[in-house]
Amino acid sequence: GCVLLPWC
């Protein structure tokens, strides 16, 4: 999962 990218 992504942490810094809200659109991931």
From Swiss-Prot:
It comes from the Eukaryota. One of its GO terms (molecular function) is toxin activity. Keywords: D-amino acid, Disulfide bond, Ion channel impairing toxin, Neurotoxin, Secreted, Toxin. It is found in: Secreted. Expressed by the venom duct. Belongs to the O2 superfamily. Contryphan family. Disulfide bonds join 2-8. Its target is unknown, but this toxin may modulate voltage-activated calcium channels (Cav) or calcium-dependent potassium channels (KCa). The cysteine framework is C-C. GO terms for cellular component: extracellular region. Its main location: secreted. This is Leu-contryphan-P. The modification D-leucine is found at residue 4.
